[in-house]
A protein has these predicted regions:
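Conserved "repeat-terminator" motif of extracellular CCP/Sushi domains
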Residues: 1-12
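Short, surface-exposed linear motifs at loops/turns and structural transition points
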Residues: 12-158
Length: 158
């Protein structure tokens, strides 16, 4: 086969859409710990094959310039062909409620010509448990239970 192939440029925002930070209210008592979630909708270009997706994150309790690479294992497929994926920091203790958790997402796929591509957000997303609790308290659509949970988070901050 002869001919020329040209790269197709894809905007990263077409592949990775950050939905924000949230707290899992069902797994812990906020006076002790909570679960901080970073939510995404992810996609790959048409005509490509999905390999994996996940995140690069910074350690909160250990000072290191290196990122930790974490591959997602619990994606939810949406009817439109996109994937909902969440990075959850488990069992965040009250002493870390003001700490900034920092991550950036990636999605990896193979193009029709066999080229493997890993698309990574250019900037890190950063949230603290305290910031997410503040956002819940300010949100007009937050339920009474959500606001109570957020108030308990704020009360637990030392």
């Amino acid at each position: 086969v002869e001919g020329a192939a040209y790269a197709k440029f894809v905007k990263i925002t077409d592949l990775l859409q950050f939905r924000g930070g949230s707290l899992r209210m069902d797994l812990s008592e906020p006076s002790v710990s909570t679960y901080l979630r970073f939510g995404y909708t992810m996609a790959i270009p048409e005509g490509t094959t999905f390999v994996e997706n996940g995140w690069y994150y910074k350690r909160v309790t250990v000072s290191s310039p290196d990122d930790v690479r974490f591959v997602a294992y619990n994606n939810a497929m949406n009817n439109d062909g996109t994937v909902t994926a969440n990075l959850v920091f488990n069992n965040v203790k009250t002493s870390l409620y003001k700490a900034n958790f920092t991550e950036k997402a990636f999605v990896k796929y193979v193009t029709a010509d066999g080229t493997t591509v890993e698309a990574v957000e250019s900037v890190y997303q950063s949230r603290s448990v305290s910031e997410v609790a503040d956002a819940i308290l300010k949100h007009p659509m937050a339920s009474k239970a959500e606001k109570e949970y957020a108030n308990n988070i704020k009360a637990a901050i030392q």
